[in-house]
């Protein structure tokens, strides 16, 4: 009997950025793998810093399917929100294909709703709101599709530890070792509820001391700054435009229109997906939820309002 096989897909969060061990990264997925099987699980981490949903679908998924994993984690989408090419309909289509592919193989899929970068960076509202709106859209898609495919879903965006600064690395975008351990612990508990994993959960306390203040500042001034520039270089002009739109609607008292449009886009994105159930066994109707809420419920499609002159 072969050991349990776990494959991790995603971006820098799953790659382990923020949890340095030796000359590389460890991260929550590696910590979780240690509690999935005895003596050990076969763990493959395909996550790459900067990956978007397209990268997961076109590059990481084929490699993962060849391994025929028992468990696969798919945490991705934040980088999509940081690009000018953001398209919630395409994101929904890609994630639907990824989740369905694993479900057809009988793989248990792990997913998560994540906080938006603007909130974690403490951006002012006119800059942070557009990013928050995008991340809520991604989270709504992830949550709805997770319900559809029976994924092991972590609604991390509302967890109290998210706002604990001690859980985050110096860049405020990636968890530190404590934060990575919290993610691993929560996934381990949910997997145990489904009969997967050992009784020994990943430790909550860090194994290594946190980086010194000087080391953190050095990282931010070198690798951290380069990381932000690489992720956001094509978004900055658009973010300025989005901020201008935000300010105009705020001045007119019509900010809610932006939320309505975002919700409408999510509704259309999910409605465009096939209603055929996983593996073709039954039909399902995808319904959206109010963006950012964990409960699954029907959500009447909002009607667009005309743009104010």
Regions found by a protein language model. Name each.
Residues 1-2, 57-68, 94-104:
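Short amphipathic alpha-helices and their capping/turn segments at secondary-structure boundaries
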Residues 23-24, 86-93, 126-134, 171, ...:
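Alpha-helix N-cap and loop-to-helix initiation/capping positions
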Residues 104-108, 151:
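A short helix->loop->beta-strand "cap" motif at the edges of active sites that frequently abuts
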Residues 1-49, 61-68, 273-276, 280-282, ...:
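Serine-esterase "nucleophile elbow" of acetyl-processing enzymes
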Residues 31, 90-93, 97-104, 137-144:
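Alpha-helical scaffolding segments of alpha/beta enzyme cores, especially the outer helices
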Residues 121-155, 177:
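Substrate-gating cap/lid alpha-helix
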Residues 148, 171-174, 178-309:
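Conserved catalytic region of serine esterases and O-acyltransferases that act on ester linkages
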Residues 15-19, 53-90, 116-117:
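Oxyanion-hole/transition-state-stabilizing segment in secreted/luminal serine hydrolases
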């Amino acid at each position: 009997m072969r050991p349990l096989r776990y494959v991790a897909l995603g971006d820098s969060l799953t790659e382990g950025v923020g949890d340095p061990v030796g000359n590389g990264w460890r991260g929550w997925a590696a910590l979780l793998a240690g509690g999935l099987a005895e003596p050990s699980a076969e763990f493959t981490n395909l996550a790459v810093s900067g990956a978007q949903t397209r990268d997961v679908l076109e590059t990481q998924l084929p490699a993962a399917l060849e391994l025929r994993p028992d468990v696969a984690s798919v945490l991705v989408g934040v980088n999509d929100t940081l690009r000018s090419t953001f398209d919630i309909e395409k994101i929904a289509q890609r994630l639907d294909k990824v989740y369905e592919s694993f479900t057809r193989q009988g793989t248990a899929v792990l997913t998560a709703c994540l906080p938006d970068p603007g909130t974690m960076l403490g951006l002012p509202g006119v800059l942070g709101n557009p990013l928050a709106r995008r991340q809520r859209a991604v989270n709504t898609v992830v949550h709805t599709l997770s319900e559809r495919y029976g994924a092991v879903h972590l609604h991390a965006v509302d967890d109290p530890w998210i706002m604990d600064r001690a859980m985050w690395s110096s860049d405020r975008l990636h968890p530190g070792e404590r934060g990575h351990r919290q993610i691993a612990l929560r996934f381990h508990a949910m997997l145990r509820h489904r009969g997967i994993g050992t009784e020994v959960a990943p430790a909550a306390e860090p194994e290594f001391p946190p980086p010194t203040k000087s080391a953190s500042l050095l990282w931010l001034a070198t690798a951290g700054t380069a990381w932000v520039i690489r992720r956001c270089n094509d978004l900055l002009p658009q973010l300025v435009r989005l901020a201008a739109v935000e300010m105009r609607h705020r001045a007119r008292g019509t900010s809610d229109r932006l939320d309505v449009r975002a919700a409408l886009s999510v509704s259309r994105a999910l409605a465009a997906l096939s209603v055929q159930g996983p593996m073709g066994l039954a039909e399902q109707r995808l319904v959206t939820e109010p963006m950012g809420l964990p409960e699954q419920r029907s959500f009447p499609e909002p009607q667009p309002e005309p743009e104010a002159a």
